[in-house]
A protein has these predicted regions:
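N-terminal Rossmann-like FAD-binding beta1-loop-alpha1 element of flavoenzymes
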Residues: 7-35
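A short, basic/flexible loop-to-alpha-helix module at the beginning of a structural domain
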Residues: 1-6
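Conserved N-terminal/central alpha/beta ligand/cofactor-binding core
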Residues: 32, 38-177
């Protein structure tokens, strides 16, 4: 069955990246947002069951140190503007996960920005990356799935804000209105 769905912005995927995009768009306001997921439930890297997240504090020293570590890690070949945004937005994670989504973090490892990059750690998107911030170990449920629980709660929050979710719905074609 073919169906046309109209939206201002379409997000493909309901994993960490897709949900992050939907969250930022919903909070910008004034947009009709549709999130499409080809699987019957939320997917993406969340199926790898992350039990922690990294957050670079929003201080000049921490932001600069994390940026420099990730720039060197990529041999300065990555999209440096994107790295800057990722590091900056990661400072919002504790507020979102702990306060808004009510995910518990029984242990937080606060890191000195001068030590960023000196040991392996769970960093943004890299399970064996270089640590570039504070590490929050989060409670899961059942066999784990701490981030899956966070993203499920985020989905419920976004649905209340009017974001539409379509599961088992791979996108077949995008029709752009050039208004």
């Amino acid at each position: 069955m073919n169906k046309t769905i109209e939206a201002d912005v379409v997000v493909m995927g309901s994993g960490v990246a897709g949900m992050g995009a939907a969250y930022k768009l919903a909070n910008a306001g004034g947009l009709k947002i549709a999130v499409f997921e080809k699987y019957p439930a939320q997917g993406g890297a969340v199926s790898n069951c992350p039990m922690c997240f990294c957050s670079t504090p929003d201080t000049p020293e921490a932001q600069k140190s994390a940026y420099e570590v990730l720039a060197r890690f990529s041999n300065y070949s990555a999209n440096m503007e994107l790295i800057s945004k990722v590091v900056k937005y990661s400072s919002e994670f504790p507020e979102l996960f702990l306060n808004q989504l009510k995910i518990e973090a029984p242990m937080v490892v606060e890191r000195d920005p001068a030590d960023y990059g000196n040991q392996r750690g769970y960093t943004m998107g890299h399970a064996n990356g270089l640590d570039v911030g504070d590490i929050y170990f989060i409670n899961g449920r059942g066999q784990g799935h701490g981030m899956a629980l966070a993203l499920l709660r985020l989905r419920f929050m976004l649905e209340k804000q009017g974001v539409d979710f379509y599961f088992s719905t791979p996108i077949k074609k995008i029709i752009r209105d050039e208004k």
